[in-house]
């Protein structure tokens, strides 16, 4: 009986964890002032914020990602995090 109860508890915990999805701010360039929250797709476990400087000033993009984007260009700064609304 104890084994059955323990098994049910473990299965419940695993099933509840599978249903979790991240919530990240999402915006592109000039719309980043508002910072609208988006429920990320299944498998997207990172929130990210990319920023870089241009002639018109600093540009920002925020969103969800399955893997943390890499800063491949000099001057591109990337922040990745794994909690809701962290970007």
Curated annotation (Swiss-Prot):
Compartment annotation: Secreted
Task: Write out the GO cellular component annotations.
Answer: extracellular region
A molecular-function term among this protein's GO annotations: ion channel regulator activity
Question: Which Pfam families does the annotation name?
Answer: Toxin_cobra-type
Q: Report keywords, A-Z.
A: Acetylcholine receptor inhibiting toxin, Disulfide bond, Ion channel impairing toxin, Neurotoxin, Postsynaptic neurotoxin, Secreted, Signal, Toxin
Q: Which cysteines are joined by disulfide bonds?
A: 24-47, 27-32, 40-64, 68-80, 81-86
Q: What is this protein called?
A: Long neurotoxin homolog
Give the function comment from the record.
Answer: Inhibits carbachol-induced muscle contraction in a reversible manner.
Tissue-wise, where is it found? Answer: Expressed by the venom gland.
The residues forming the signal peptide are: 1-21
Q: What is its main location?
A: secreted
Q: Which family does it belong to?
A: Belongs to the three-finger toxin family. Ancestral subfamily. Orphan group IV sub-subfamily.
């Amino acid at each position: 009986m104890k084994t059955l109860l323990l098994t049910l508890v473990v299965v419940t915990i695993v099933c509840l964890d599978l249903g979790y999805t991240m919530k990240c701010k999402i915006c592109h360039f000039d719309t980043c002032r508002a910072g609208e929250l988006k429920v990320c797709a299944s498998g997207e476990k990172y929130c990210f914020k990319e920023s870089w400087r241009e002639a018109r000033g600093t540009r920002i993009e925020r969103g969800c990602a399955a893997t943390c984007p890499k800063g491949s260009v000099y001057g591109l700064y990337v922040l990745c995090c794994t909690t809701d609304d962290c970007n």
